[in-house]
Amino acid sequence: MQTGYQAVIDKYYPHNDELRHILLTHSRSVADLALALAKRLPEQDLDLQFIEEAAMLHDIGIVRCDAPSIHCHGTEPYIAHGRQGAEMLRAEGMPRHARVCERHTGAGITRQSIESQQLPLPLQDFLPETLEEQLICYADKFFSKTKLDRQKTVEQAEKSLAKFGEDGIVRFRAWVERFGEPPIVLPAT
């Protein structure tokens, strides 16, 4: 029997091609790390099923984006993949999962950053708010869609956030303090 998230992935990624492989491999790595981090926080009573589902769907919108290096041949700029994914998941009746999509880019993106960098996004804050949203966003920073077989160090993950501005680095450092150094999870290749 298919999981709910698998049916959504199958709908938007029906072909067994490189893009689907990239999405599934990256998302499984993010889900595994997010779940490992969540299990460190038993007192928080986190929704582990939701964490797995939302982590598996957080990048669903890449199919609509133009990023040939990862086999995406859509029309939207890559920075908009979170918003695109959120739109897709809201259409599927998954508003809680949609919030993860639109809030995971960088360490979240502020309205101020959107304005100052002239990003093609609505002028509003896209910041992870719930603990589940934060854990998935944090876990995502340790995996790239171009190097599926590697997990980044904290230093490498932080460096990759520099393009989003100092406020994202500050949020990321707070997550390192709150959630700790991530355990090594074997990337799902």
Regions found by a protein language model. Give the residues of each.
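A general alpha-helix detector
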Residues: 8-12, 33, 84-85, 138, ...
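Divalent metal-dependent catalytic cores for phosphoryl transfer on phosphate-bearing substrates
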Residues: 43-150, 154
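Charge-dense, low-complexity intrinsically disordered segments
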Residues: 17, 21-24, 129, 163-166
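Generic alpha-helical structural element
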Residues: 19, 90, 146, 161-164
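Charged phosphate-binding loop/patch that engages nucleotide di/tri-phosphates or the phosphate backbone
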Residues: 161-189
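Alpha-helix initiation and N-capping motif
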Residues: 1-6, 94, 154, 169
